[in-house]
Amino acid sequence: MQTTDPRRTPRLDPDARTTKPARAARPPQRRGPSQSTLVFAAVLVVIVLAAVLVLVLVSRHDRAPAGDSAAQATPTAQATEQDTVLAEAKRLAAQYDYDKAIAAVTGIAGWESVPELQQAKADFEAQKAQAVRYADPTTIPHVFFHTLIADTARAFDGDPEQGGYNQFMVTIKEFNAVLQSLYERDFVLVDIHDIAGPQQQADGSTKYVAGDIYLPAGKKPIVMSQDDVCYYEYMTDSDGDGLPDKGGDGFASRLLVKDGKLTCEYVDADGQTRYGSYDLVPLLDDFLAEHPDFSYRGARATIAVTGYQGAFGYRISDDYKAKLGDAAFAQACKDAREVADALRAEGYTIASHSYGHLTYGDISAERLAADSRKWEEQIESVIGETDVLLYPFGSDIAGVEAYKGAKFDTLYADGFRYFCNVDSAKHWVQIHDGYVRQGRRNIDGYRMYYQPNLLDDLFDTKTVWDDARPTPVPKI
């Protein structure tokens, strides 16, 4: 139903603008000027009056739309901008970034005279006042996943790879259920850098200190990561031609930016290439779009890359240069960098999972140094620097004692400051003067089947378990 906008200046009737004034009645005959003179004078008067009237009407016509447009467009534009900024401010507040939310509202010109904006500012200030500092960042848990199974029929088809998938992977259905449980149990994603960071001391030195995480009472921070986000060829390419195909085992084949969003490429059982939420990153993004309060100030997961088969599904390691050719290799590097930039912009952290997926705790210091150098030269040079190392196989270079020795010296010189092993404890964090260590808890088929009690603070395995998973899960 159309309604009349009281702000709109009515337009003139087009017919009114073209109607000439009625001719005046002819005066009675009298002696004086000749009849022809009088007729000429009358016609001249009519012409002059008509011209004046037209000028007046045109002038009013020109002014009315301009005034009408300004009167209508300016408030509308202001309202649209206000609504957009207010929606973003509410999202920031939902993610516990109250200062940015307040700054967004007070950045709107004239906000003091808009009741809705005044109320929003007051609400954000009240929420900030109620937030409490998380008392002990060393009790923050860290959970991790491998590549998610998109098609259980292909992953669990009885081939030699089925056992490994059953042991070390979770399905998309299970991952979504885990997210829902974590959310319902008041966990909130934080970045690993939120646990602790460098702070300049009075003497000019730098020391890592516990971070200040402010959340509503009852909320609990948690770190999430994913290993091997390179999309191994053996999982997606059945004929060895370097391309994903229908003979793959039901996993995404790469991350990419499509229509401005991070998504996955996936080749289904019919050989059709699809794009969508087929692995952790887009699935987590989907969840956070519905539940922004599951993220602390925009934090998402840490994405760990194993370098020898590239990054994010792009074969950018030196071994692929000759195979791909210069042009295709350069394009792969460009695409990988685009994904890395998009991940960071979305709130993800990128980590090294080594170059060759070697057990850093067992190999020699020389071999570790060579592997780290390959990561730095072939992978980091493309996707950007990181200070986070997630040990392959969880194999740490030391026990609970402080780091020292050649291995640590190499990794520290290569820029790593956050080091994560794998541990079954609910949480394990060390904050040292120059670095941070954290234990990660694996969420996978093996842990869910044999040790569900180690996960019961996070979720109920019975409600998460995907019945498409074969049992028993093979023992390790």
Predicted regions, residues:
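Amphipathic coiled-coil/heptad-repeat helices and related helical stalk/stem segments
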Residues: 85, 175, 335-336, 404
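Alpha-helical transmembrane segments
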Residues: 47-52
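N-terminal Sec-pathway targeting helices
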Residues: 29-46
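Hydrophobic single-pass membrane-insertion segments
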Residues: 53-67
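C-terminal active-site subregion of NodB/CE4 polysaccharide deacetylases
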Residues: 102-105, 110-111, 125-195, 204, ...
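N-terminal targeting leaders characterized by basic, low-complexity, disordered sequences
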Residues: 1-33
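N-terminal, intrinsically disordered, polar/charged segments of Gram-positive cell-envelope systems
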Residues: 63-130
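Metal-dependent polysaccharide deacetylase catalytic core of the NodB/CE4 family, i.e.
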Residues: 138-158, 207-208, 216-222, 229-397, ...
